[in-house]
UniProtKB/Swiss-Prot annotation:
Gene3D superfamilies, A to Z: Ankyrin repeat-containing domain
ANK repeat residues: 64-94, 98-128, 132-161
Stated family: Belongs to the ANKRD39 family.
Pfam families found in the cross-reference section: Ank_2
Entry keywords, A to Z: ANK repeat, Repeat
Alphabetized PANTHER family for the sequence: ANKYRIN REPEAT FAMILY A (PTHR24124), CHROMOSOME UNDETERMINED SCAFFOLD_25, WHOLE GENOME SHOTGUN SEQUENCE (PTHR24124:SF14)
InterPro entries: Ankyrin_rpt, Ankyrin_rpt-contain_sf
Source taxon at top rank: Eukaryota
Gene: ankrd39
Protein species of origin: Dictyostelium discoideum
UniProt entry tagged with the keyword Amino-acid biosynthesis: no
Keyword Ribosomal protein: no
Name under which the protein is recorded: Ankyrin repeat domain-containing protein 39 homolog
Length: 174
């Protein structure tokens, strides 16, 4: 029997299908039962239990190259989970294989509270670029979120960095 769950990022609803464990791959089972699935489901208590048993899970990459913090920062309702991960040693500047940081993800998903939290926690690398040459400021302008743009600028983001298409962040404003 298929089970559907929904989550939202950047105004786009994702409809993932959960299928009986008989047909799930090991990667899917690991994700669903691990810290990443608990974060996607905003299950603070489960994340807390998992981290209590093994705090190194806060820096464990999934099979797609994402860390728990990448999932948590996508949605402001996970602000307490973001804080919990950071309190348990999550690397605030961790990068996916495509170079995206948690700050890239929070900016792209318009997660204002998580962006504020990341910046206030002392991100020192506000201008890390991803595989497209984009900084978090590029992502914020791309989404048209001026509140996040202004936050990034207040924390020293460089508005003159060019992405791979030779575009400054402001040129991506919708």
């Amino acid at each position: 029997m298929d089970k559907h769950h929904n989550h939202e990022c950047n105004g786009h609803e994702c409809n993932h299908v959960q299928v009986d464990s008989v047909t799930q791959s090991l990667d899917e089972l690991n994700f669903e039962r691990g810290i990443w699935g608990s974060i996607i489901n905003s299950d603070f208590k489960k994340v807390e239990q998992l981290l209590y048993k093994n705090s190194s899970l806060s820096n464990t990459m999934d099979s797609s190259g994402y860390y728990p913090l990448h999932y948590a920062v996508r949605n402001d309702k996970n602000n307490d989970i973001v804080q919990l991960l950071l309190d348990n040693g999550a690397n605030i500047n961790c990068q996916t294989s495509g170079g995206a940081t948690p700050l890239h993800r929070s900016c792209f998903c318009n997660s204002i509270n998580n962006t504020k939290l990341l910046l206030k926690k002392g991100i020192t690398k506000v201008d890390l670029i991803d595989s497209d040459g984009m900084t978090p400021l590029h992502k914020a302008y791309q989404q048209g979120n001026m509140e996040i743009v202004n936050l990034l600028l207040q924390f020293g983001a460089d508005p003159n960095i060019l992405d791979k298409n030779k575009m400054k962040p402001i040129q991506l404003l919708k």
